[in-house]
């Protein structure tokens, strides 16, 4: 769960030397949340019970954000591949994959991440 966005790509902060981040844009899950960049992912995770203890959630959200930035409509296999290396002992991953797939569909339909800051009707 040590994932951050480094110049738009998800990287493990715990495996990245500070010199490698020199001059780069670094975004944490908190920064992505405050900017509403992942609001739709957070809502979808909540709606689909894609989190339980929450330990893996920051890494899953950063990974999903990076994936959907690179590829608007990834297949379920591509989602699973992107998530490899992020371990969840609680959910079995299907709800996480479902949530990411749902966000990809919503974004393809023209909804934005910020749309999900509003409470559901």
Question: Which positions does each model-derived feature cover?
Answer:
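Signature of N-terminal electron-transfer/Fe-S-associated modules in redox systems
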Residues: 1-121
